[in-house]
Amino acid sequence: MIQIKNLKKEYRTNNTSNLVLDNINLEIKQGEIFGIIGHSGAGKSSLLRCLNLLEQPTDGSIFIADENITKKNSKQLREFRKKVAMIFQHFNLLSSRNVFENIALPLEIQGIPKSEIKKRVFELLDLVELPNKANAYPQELSGGQKQKVAIARALALNPLVLLSDEATSALDPTSTKQILALLKRLNKELGLTIVLITHEMDVVRKICDRVAIIDKGRIAEMGKTLDVFLNPQAPVTRSFVETSIHTKVPDFIAKKLQDNPYSYDNTYPVVQLTFYGDKGKMPIIAEISRQFNATASIIQANIETIQDQIVGIAICHITGERQDWENALRFLSNQDVNLKVLGYATADNI
C-alpha cells in the first residue's frame, strides 16, 4: 500500500540546513493501523506530511497504491489527494459553517450534486455516531465531537488512506478513548489504512498493528506493536515503553542489585517474567516451588493490555540453595515466557 524508499527531507534557510528525515525506509500494509512515534522535533510530522506531499521530500520516493507520488505534477497531485485524507490535532473546522456544511465542503469542491451531498453527509454522520448534530456549529461541540466531524469530513471522498496528525493530543481521556475506538472500527469496517503520529505510547498500544519509533530523523526501531512493547531494543524505545507500561525496575530495588551472584554470600536472582496470551495461564511460579524447592517471592506485578492481548509483568526474587535456584532459572528459560535476570540480592535486602 505505502512504500517509502530512501526518503530525506532537508530544510534550508540562507546558509544553514536542517536534515529532519534521513534515509527513511518503511512499508505500510493495506488495511493496517501503523503508528509513528517520537519526541518533539524527531521528524514524525514531517514524515506524515510527506505522505500527501504537503512537504516535498528532498530525496527519495514514496509509492501509494503502486503510484510514485513524488513524480506527479500539480494536476495529478490534486487528483491523488482524494485518496489520502488527513485529520489534525486542532480539527480545522470552519466556525462559520455548521456540522453538515463542514462535512459537505470537499463534496462541494468536487461539484457533487446537492442531493448526493445530502445523502453522503448523513451517511457519514451515522458512521461517526453524530446523527443529530447536522445543524450544530463547532463552538457548540465538545473536543471529541469536533474530531468526529473532522473524521467524517476526511472520509467524504472515500479515501484509501487516513493520516492522523496527533488527532487525540488535544482531547481529554474519555474523548481520546472514543476517537481511538472509532478509528479502529473504521479500519475494520472500511478496510481503511491508517497512519498516525503521536508522542503517546498509550495510543500506539491500544490500536496500532505495527509501530516505528523515530529519533533524530531516523527510524530507531520498527516492528509489531506487541513485540516492540515486550522487547524494546533502542534506548529511545525503552524510554517510551516505560511511560506506558510498568517495565522499569523500581529504583529502590535497582540500587540493591548486584551484577555478580557471587558478590556476597547468599545472593539470589531477581528476575522479570513477562506473560501474554495463553502463557499467562501457566502456573510457572508454583512450579518453581514444587519442582525445585525454591521460593519465588513476587516483589511487583501488574497487568497490561496491548493490542487486545493481556500482558502480565512480574518481578520475583527466587531464593533457595544455589543449585535449586540455578535449576529454576534453567526451567524458566525453557518456558514460553520472557525471562530477564535483573541482578542478584540477598534475601533480607529486598
Swiss-Prot record:
It is found in: Cell inner membrane. It catalyses: L-methionine(out) + ATP + H2O = L-methionine(in) + ADP + phosphate + H(+); D-methionine(out) + ATP + H2O = D-methionine(in) + ADP + phosphate + H(+). It is a peripheral membrane protein. PANTHER family: AMINO ACID IMPORT ATP-BINDING PROTEIN (PTHR43166), METHIONINE IMPORT ATP-BINDING PROTEIN METN (PTHR43166:SF30). Part of the ABC transporter complex MetNIQ involved in methionine import. Responsible for energy coupling to the transport system. The complex is composed of two ATP-binding proteins (MetN), two transmembrane proteins (MetI) and a solute-binding protein (MetQ). Belongs to the ABC transporter superfamily. Methionine importer (TC 3.A.1.24) family. This is Methionine import ATP-binding protein MetN. It comes from Francisella tularensis subsp. holarctica (strain LVS).
